Amino acid sequence: MENELFMNAGVSHPPVMTSPSSSSAMLKWVSMETQPVDPSLSRNLFWEKSTEQSIFDSALSSLVSSPTPSNSNFSVGGVGGENVIMRELIGKLGNIGDIYGITASNGNSCYATPMSSPPPGSMMETKTTTPMAELSGDPGFAERAARFSCFGSRSFNSRTNSPFPINNEPPITTNEKMPRVSSSPVFKPLASHVPAGESSGELSRKRKTKSKQNSPSAVSSSKEIEEKEDSDPKRCKKSEENGDKTKSIDPYKDYIHVRARRGQATDSHSLAERVRREKISERMKLLQDLVPGCNKVTGKALMLDEIINYVQSLQRQVEFLSMKLSSVNTRLDFNMDALLSKDIFPSSNNLMHHQQVLQLDSSAETLLGDHHNKNLQLNPDISSNNVINPLETSETRSFISHLPTLAHFTDSISQYSTFSEDDLHSIIHMGFAQNRLQELNQGSSNQVPSHMKAEL
């Protein structure tokens, strides 16, 4: 049964021996062994036995040596995996060898030694009942069996008359590709972990992204974006010059300046740089309006030079005007305290000066009293109104007019609050004493003796 299953993979034939288990098949073969063999057919039977045995042994060795696929989708008796099927098959074959006198030992196993065939009687029975197609000893059969074995494919499930309870699945279409199983166990975990579809998809994506980056369409699109960004401020300038109040571009928002990587620039960085340059240009326009003749200059460097020259000229003009004001207003440097201390009363002789003024006042009063009494005695008819000469009165008036008035002193006092009252009284007494001395000198020029003049 196993021979037919392997040799006719994917082709359903009516089984020769329909037995529920392997033990019944063994009993039937043992019963056949006791029957006599026809000697006329012995040569042909043994030749067929040798050919079938060599083909079956090569197929079985390739089946055992080929690795089983890791992802098995069928289950045997509720237990998933192909190991169960292989164990049952090897056990059955071993039992067959034990029955015919070939035991599996260390040096003689069922894999290395040729397996014994059933007796000639059984071969005759199978020959007569079901004619099997003879297979030639093709050396590439083992490789094909290892690659496309009935256990690794889904054709094994298509057999409905098999004794194993296997879930039936739809057959494989011709358009689908068979998964190639790795021949060595070292590469099997790598093939199981890395699916072929994902790796090929990732490689294709990488190639597509590289081709898109290097394509001329991407380069042209980036250039168009840069040209649009450069043309935006130019449009704003043209609209401002023409006086159009409508804004062609929305006002930019305030962006945070982010430090970009080396050799790269982010969108926020470029926008923030553009906003900063626009603010600088606005301030330059304000300066351009303030500085006369700066509108004729083109370029920021020349504009800055003109502004610097204009500021320096303004500074020179301010210095010249300050010097002119200081030369015109001389009273600003006039120090009243220094003049009073030097000319009117020195600080060292201040007390002596007060004493001399008081002595002059007392002596003048005594002299005036004596002179008045003598005039009354000599000229009793002259009234008291004509005592003073009218010339003397005119001279005294002119002299008083030249003297500083009290208003002048009050102005100086208001300007200098630190001026003391004692100094003010001394100045007033000094003025009155001088007036009296002049009157005495003019009135008694003819009458006062010479010794009085010497004392004065």
UniProtKB/Swiss-Prot annotation:
Its main location: nucleus. Residues 264-314 form the bHLH domain. The keyword Endoplasmic reticulum does not apply. GO terms for cellular component: nucleus. Homodimer. PANTHER family: STEROL REGULATORY ELEMENT-BINDING PROTEIN, TRANSCRIPTION FACTOR BHLH62-RELATED. This is Transcription factor bHLH62.
